[in-house]
Amino acid sequence: MKQLLKPLFLVLLCVWSLSLHADVFKGIVIDAETRQPLSGVTIKAVQSGQGSDDWIITNDYTSDSLGHFVAEVWMEGRIAFTFSSIGYHSTRIVDYSYGMESSDSVDMGTIALHPTAIMLQKVQVSAKMPRITMSGDTVVFHPEAFKLEEGDRLDVLIRKLPGVEQRNGQLFWNGKPIRLKMNGKDVFGGGSILGQLPVVAADKIKLYEKQSELAKHTGNDDGDGQQVLDIQVKPNFLDKWFGFASADLRTKREYQVQLRASRLSEKNPVMAYGNLNNENYATAFGQSWATMWPIDYYGRNQYGTVNYQHNWELKGAKEGTENYINFGPSMAHRDGWGTDVESTDYFLPGQQRSFSLMNNAHKNHELVPSFNSEGSFYTDEKNQFSYNLMLEFTKGNKHNETHRAQFDDDPYQFADNPLAESATAPFGSPLYQHLTMRDDSHIDTKTKQTNLHLDMHWAHFLGEKGRYGLGTSTTYKDDFSRMSSRRDVSSPHGLNYQMWQYGHNSGVDWQSSLSENLSYWFDKNFMVEVTNETEYKYLRHRNHFYADTDAFYVVGDRPTTLDPANSLLEHTRLWKNSVKLGTLLKFNKKLMLKSNLSWISQRETTNYLRGRLDTVARRVSNIFNPEVKLQWKNGRRASFDLSWLYETKLPELLSTLDYEDSTDPLYITMGNARLKREHDYLFELRHHRLFPRLQLNLMLKLSYGHTINPVVSAFCYNPSTGVYRTKPMNTPSHNRYNAELDYDQGLGISWRLHNKMTAEWARSYGYLLATNFNQPLHLNPLSRFTYKDNMELSYEKQSLSVKPYVEFTYNRYRYQASTINNSDLIRCDFGLKTVYTKDHFEFVSNVHDLFRSGYLMREFNGHRWLWDIQVMYKMLKNKAAIILKVADIFNRDTSFSNVSEAYSRTEKWHDTNHRYISISFGYQLDPKPQHK
């Protein structure tokens, strides 16, 4: 019987083999210079697929004596061929195979390999991996598959990862914030450290969702996981010091010096950083975060910090638990200055108009020492303690010099610079006839402020059932300020006067809370979470204010007459109790429903004394805020989030009092006793889809918002005195619809297309500028449509990178009651960024055309060609670099912004140092890895 089965099996095997199909890839490899066939070329085919189990198949082939090769591919999926030979540059070709579903013969044609500069030098040839692979629910990025140079830092690699972006030191994945870790541990400075570590130190980069502490202990997903970008650092790069130093010199005597040292360690990481510059950059570093922001339009910064952290493991604790404590003192000294130019068009009923022009030159000085500490650790396998401490002191000085002028018609019809010319406009001239008021003021303010914040939490895990926790939080702020000013007011209507003002202000703001929380799983599919928090808040505010219009009563530029209308004493006490009931229902491994219902009960009391207003206001309120979220997740490849929430917002109790603040006599703020609470509805649908085979990442978001009783600012204007009054008021409901699509795809090896489109439709209301608040106000419905499209197509190959891009924004405003103010605003920035690398040189060019249309300040409309270039020379194995930069070659850059409301339209402009030449030097200090 066995003798019969054996030949029968062989026959069946042959028949089955003949029935199989496969794609056949073939071609010829030649020398690009001599055009001669190359034999013995290594051809590595790496194929990846997507299914229930992710897989990668690698096969090696060799060209024959005539340069020919043949590769049979049995599986369906993306396939990457790498052609390499000693003395030649490697070439990579990406294709797709349909495997056994096809029997195509794919002719890849002629593949030409370019010889290296030293043809006979022996080189190491390594196989290329795909950029992205999947390992369960983890996205794995392979650094060796990206186009990188020796000495490149990790930030260069991160910018190439599909779906990952960096904003001010914070990393995002598909618009959601992610936390940076190294070997599963937090690192000081967050994403900022990416510019310091070499790519060669990274083995792999993993993107995954880190479970919450509750999920780790219960084994049930509670939907509160955090996106994590985990850089797997090679062991021989740990417990080493990495350093960075840079110096930059600009024209106009600007400079910047940076020093940074980091010790990567799984147990005791340390980071020290210092920054000295007058290029208008403020810096701050902390545990797992870093940020940089402009101080002002011009500025100086001196900043230094040292951060230390200790990590340890607890025997018996769940895998992946974190135990650490860190602290970091810092000192910052900042000076900022600049000038704002502002034009505001207030909308009146009919064809009437009111224009306000302002020029404000300001200077700021701050000294800010601070101390931060954070810790989280397990005392045993079931109890966790965490805290966060921040202590900060700020001492500052401010000076403002402001010039304002108000007109009853568009002043740009009568002068090119109406604000400056209004001071000397001759009597009877058109500009003088439409001038209603001019104000020149000088204000000096000195401040001192102390801030303390402390959070402490204890959690006890109830095995697989859940967690019980207690927490307390305290915030304390003590501030003191002194203000002195001089104001000169003139008007064609005969209202001319000088005013001196002085005030010293002190305040204490203290807030403490105690909370308890219970999260309990009834089974693996249903969890209930209950939180109760009791909060007490105390506010004391005192202001002694003096004002004189007669120089006789002014002593040393300080008035001596008390101004009771602006002297105040305020005491506010608040008791608030918040109860939150949350549930989580898991229908299966992919689908879950989360719901929350909050009940906030609070009692407020305010004792307020200001001028003739001496009152005690009390408010007792109960607020219910529900929220529902439906989540569907198919691993890392696809997800749906559908959410709805309802929120009630109470106006500040002070804003509901009939007070009047005339500290600025030309811009008076008032309260409104009839102010109602706001109610917000928000519906949102978010869908994410990842196609690793196509290197495609998609994100779609749809949302609808509805606001009941929205609060806006209403304005009243007296043309004879030039005084504006404003107070908060409710309007009819607002509506807004939003749609957003983010498309990010790698096209083969060298191309990448990224397009982010956003459209928003909104309808809101405001009140036209009135002349008397005692008269009925006129509503002005506003319909707005906004479309934004940010698209870039990047090409990277060998030493060339080209990126054409366009950033387009269109705003359409339609006012029902003041159609004269309808506008269509366009901002389009179209350009080309080019990076060319040759040996140790890198040339960067960014030339673009910034087009604006529809703005009131006519000089900002039209085309503005902008061009920046930069040349960098790398040396010392790419660890050091000299950079020469020329910014705004055509001297056409401007800083311009626009804000349109239902009651006004404001345009602002300010100057910065946008045109300069700079030279900088930077050096990376990398340790030598120990090969174990």
Placement of each model-derived feature along the sequence:
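A short, solvent-exposed loop/turn motif at the edges and junctions
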Residues: 49-52, 56, 78-97
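Short, acidic Ser/Thr/Gly-rich low-complexity loop/linker segments typical of extracellular
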Residues: 50-68
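Periplasmic plug
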Residues: 167-215, 228-233
